[in-house]
Amino acid sequence: MRLRPFTEPDLELFERFATDPALSEPFGWVGFMPPGGYRKRWEQDGLLGSIPYCLAVVTIDDDALVGWVDWRETERPGRGAWEIGVLIVPEMRGRGAGTAAQRLLVEYLFSTTTAFRIWAATEAENIAEQRALERSGFSQEGRLRGTHFRDGQWRDSFIYGIIRDDISGSSPAA
């Protein structure tokens, strides 16, 4: 896997995720999104100039789009903390794509920003994502009660984090 900026043909994937609940289920579906919203953002800034920032996750062999990663500065902006997220197409789940994408995003953020901490939240029931985060070097830091509303009920989340010191040889970007 590798990360790259989005190209115009990639925008179809966003439209599919915005209109087809089956692609995001069971944990990623948050409701229908306005059609064309991501296209407008891509035309403005390539999905890299506004929050959340987004990069495409593609295969190395044939540059096939398999999902995306996003990130946003959190916890007192300017203090070096980023929240990340990942969404992988169903046919690539369980094959290491999410783990690789999150690992690559951590490497990217630690090498290009002064971030000291990167974190992610996932539903307590999302065992696959918990394993992917752990394989990517994250540690479980805690449980937040009632943070996600899905299928008519509030659900708990686990918070996972990684700090720059966890990765040997990682120093802030100049």
Predicted ranges, named:
Residues 22-43:
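Conserved GNAT-fold acetyl-CoA-binding loop/helix
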Residues 43-56:
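A short helix-loop-beta-strand connector motif used in the catalytic cores of GNAT acetyltransferases and
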Residues 1-21, 54, 58-174:
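Acyl-donor (CoA/ACP) binding surface of acyl/acetyltransferases
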